[in-house]
Regions:
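Alpha-helical transmembrane segments in multi-pass membrane proteins
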Residues: 42-96, 109-123, 145, 149-150, ...
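Membrane-embedded alpha-helical segments of small multi-pass membrane proteins
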Residues: 315-352, 359-388
């Protein structure tokens, strides 16, 4: 009995010794991965993209070998694949010492949302358009409730996983590689966006034709540059994950609710008309890359304290008022309800920088609230018209 107890004690000591050594090895590996040279960081960033694509492709093929899975809903399969990728890249994030991305928020939520204001407008435009398309387009039968749930889960996972891979891992590795200057940070931003865009060529393996895929690649590249610039300015991972999810959800809403089309079918509908997205995304991209914004980034990454003065507060007040007025003017169909939200954010920031004698910011807040409320009312009104059939009757009367 005494011998047995001694053996148990020895085995326990050996187990904890092995575990301790394993922990030490992981610490050493993490330290090495944190201190990679600039070329090595770039190589690992590009390698992460290939790992991501390979995981998507091979996980999907593996699921196809499981009996019965070939009949499963496309979005269920995508949710499973994205979960696998998420788990693996969480491990990669930990090994490269990037775990803090989930806690960072350098600018605070108000400034973060204002900095990403374009995507507030774009996200709500995508959602409103998607809802209207569900009412107006020709669709198959409504999917089973559980398949609609799979759609929402899959889209949420896609947004989360792609932001984890391309902003959380790839872009942060590029930031480590490039110098913390205006040019260096801009280089990381542009390369991060380009890699995000090129990744979408992998959709050709899912049946997307080249012309449609090329439009998606260019649009995604421009969007990737915007996402990288916003992330560099705010260090707010969760905000971008939400933006990404909402944009995808708006664009794919009809395919998630109705039978008869998947993601590839939706992308194959892209035509020359979709090239307008290049302008819609290109203008805010160049605005975000302006010199003053890049100077602010250089200060941020060199630990220089940035404080908005009264002059900045006055500018924000004017922006708020302009956005508020525009939100009222364009409130009719509800597409641009995001203008009112961004106007409210600008007004709030203006009042922080200029607390007194700031009537313009107050006017901006009031007009922005009015514009947002009108947009919501108009959107609900349009949905009622579509659902009741009144809209169709009005169209038929004019024909």
């Amino acid at each position: 009995m005494k011998s047995f107890a001694c053996n148990v004690k020895v085995n326990a000591i050996e187990y904890f010794h092995i575990k301790l050594n394993a922990n030490e090895e992981i610490k050493v590996m993490k330290q090495k991965l944190r201190n990679l040279s600039a070329p090595a960081n770039i190589i690992f960033a590009i390698l992460a993209v290939f790992i991501f694509i390979a995981l998507l492709q091979w996980s999907g093929k593996f699921l196809g070998l499981i009996p019965g899975m070939e009949k499963a809903d496309d979005y269920l399969l995508q949710a499973i694949v994205e979960t696998v990728v998420l788990v693996i890249f969480l491990g990669i994030t930990y090994l490269f010492g990037l775990w803090d991305i989930f806690k960072e928020n350098a600018a605070g939520w108000t400034r973060s949302l204002y900095t990403g204001g374009f995507f507030i407008v774009y996200c709500l435009y995508a959602v409103v358009s998607g809802i209207y398309l569900c009412f107006l387009g020709e669709h198959g039968d409504v999917k089973a409730f559980y398949n609609i749930i799979f759609f929402f889960i899959a889209v949420c996972l896609v947004g989360l996983v792609e932001e984890l891979v391309f902003r959380g891992v790839v872009f942060n590795l590029l930031l480590r590689a490039f110098p913390k200057t205006k040019g260096g940070i801009t280089g990381a931003v542009v390369l991060g966006g380009v890699l995000f865009g090129l990744m979408h060529f992998s959709n050709m393996g899912a049946g997307v034709k080249f012309s449609s895929c090329l439009i998606q690649v260019i649009s995604a590249g421009l969007m990737g540059v915007l996402f990288c610039m916003i992330y560099a300015s705010t260090r707010n991972f969760w905000m971008l994950a939400i933006f990404h999810t909402v944009v995808d959800m708006g664009g794919l809403l009809s395919s998630g609710i109705f039978e008869g089309g998947g993601v590839a079918d939706r992308i194959n509908e892209f035509s020359a008309m979709n090239c307008i997205a290049f302008v819609v995304l290109g203008i805010p991209m160049f605005v975000m890359l302006r010199k003053s914004r890049r100077i602010r980034l250089e200060m941020l990454y060199n630990n220089v304290t940035i404080i908005d003065d009264e002059r900045e507060g006055a500018k924000l007040a004017v922006v708020s008022l302009v956005l508020g007025i525009c939100s009222i003017i364009f409130s009719f169909f509800g597409y641009l309800m995001g203008l009112g939200i961004v106007g409210m954010l600008a007004s709030k920031m203006s009042k922080r920088a200029k607390q007194y004698n700031n009537a313009i910011a107050t006017a901006g807040m009031i007009t922005s609230i009015i514009g947002f409320v009108l947009s919501v009312i108009c959107t609900i009104g349009m949905m009622v018209l579509f659902a009741s059939g009144i809209y169709d009757r009005l169209v038929n009367m004019t024909m």
